[in-house]
């Protein structure tokens, strides 16, 4: 059996399957003879050392781990340790995320401002850069597309419009995704996340489904998180769709999760340090901003929620 017991290698968890971890390792520069038959990367089916469970260390997709006792013939190994995370997205659970790309459909299903904002706030809460991917732009007019782009710009976000039917915007999206290490593709069901991955990485061929005509929203096809290589050492995570992300935040911090509010608060200060930007005198937040009613509604939910600092 071709097994390496003495050398520990680093790898990244690309999927969780039952009680196993799928770990990808890169050994192209390793000089040991046992690697001669391999080129580039290989995925190993791994179990974890029991000490990790005793220590209360959870392992999720995206975690950087140490693997040992590698059986190259059967592609199996043991995960012995996990490195500290640089970031963590709670839902979907992915570690070391550098970009959250939120897929929003221009049509079918219809755009939902509250839903979109909740996904953006999920990234903001985790202090991870968000990017909006506007899908299905072949279903709308050029004027409507301009309105979408201007809307997201007023919120403080970049937007890459794409269509898998005519490949519009695909090259720009690939270029952007290859500039970051690990991108999570998130968004509600039915917006075309899985179809987009199939278009970006044709060798993947993930199952897809159409939008329900009765419910007017998508159905879930992705059941678990998995990482896929998109070139230049970058990884892309497909995630299960869900339609109402929860917001967990201190009420006093909530306004700082909105880029358009942050801009105003950085230019001038409210009269009172504990201003929640409701009806306090001397508040500098423009109450006519598009997302201000959404902010107020969810702020009240946070304040009145029986659970600590949660809206949703």
Swiss-Prot record:
Zn(2+) binds at residues 270, 275, 277, 283. SUPFAM superfamilies: P-loop containing nucleoside triphosphate hydrolases. GO terms for cellular component: cytoplasm. Transmembrane segments: none annotated. Keywords: Cytoplasm, GTP-binding, Hydrolase, Metal-binding, Nucleotide-binding, Ribosome biogenesis, RNA-binding, rRNA-binding, Zinc. GTP binds at residues 135-138, 187-195. It is found in: Cytoplasm. The keyword Transcription does not apply. It comes from the Bacteria. Residues 86-245 form the CP-type G domain. Binds 1 zinc ion per subunit. One of several proteins that assist in the late maturation steps of the functional core of the 30S ribosomal subunit. Helps release RbfA from mature subunits. May play a role in the assembly of ribosomal proteins into the subunit. Circularly permuted GTPase that catalyzes slow GTP hydrolysis, GTPase activity is stimulated by the 30S ribosomal subunit. This is Small ribosomal subunit biogenesis GTPase RsgA.
